[in-house]
Regions:
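Substrate-binding pocket helix/loop in short-chain dehydrogenase/reductase
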Residues: 95-96, 103-108
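Conserved glycine-rich Rossmann-like NAD(P)H-binding loop of the short-chain dehydrogenase/reductase
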Residues: 29-45
Length: 134
């Protein structure tokens, strides 16, 4: 693994297993991590496990205002964001032919639109620091 001492990572979907493991790996490599998700309890448990260099930022990625605020909150908490892990995603357990337009749009809002908005929200700061990892 790389030495990420002094780097700051924002991980979405960190309240789930994959996001939690990503946060653990980046933290173990020396990064400060901002862990984000919709469920506060698993985020707080992960933060307690990691100890220092961790910030809990709840965010519902289906809310455009919350998505816009998340990169700013992460940068304020950590000083900057050098690494963005767009791990969060949703599915609607339904046959495609039965999926409503609203269900389809909610999946796209979280899995695609929020991803683009988060990238856009952190990119300027990453470019200034000349260290970009998306």
């Amino acid at each position: 693994m790389f030495d990420l001492t002094g780097k700051n990572a924002l991980i979405t979907g960190a309240s789930g297993r994959i996001g939690g493991e990503i946060a653990k790996a980046l933290h173990a490599a020396g990064a400060t991590v901002a862990i984000s998700g919709t469920r506060l309890e698993p985020l707080e448990a992960l933060a307690a496990e990691l100890g220092d260099r961790v910030h809990v930022l709840t965010c519902n990625l289906s809310d455009p205002d919350a998505v816009e605020a998340l990169p700013k909150a992460a940068a304020e908490a950590m000083g900057s964001v050098n690494i963005l892990v767009n791990n969060a995603g949703i599915t609607r357990d339904n046959l495609f032919m039965r999926m409503s337009d609203d269900e389809w749009n909610s999946v796209l809002d979280v899995n695609l639109t929020a991803t683009m908005r988060l990238c856009r929200g952190v990119l300027r700061g990453m470019m200034k620091s000349r260290w970009v990892a998306l």
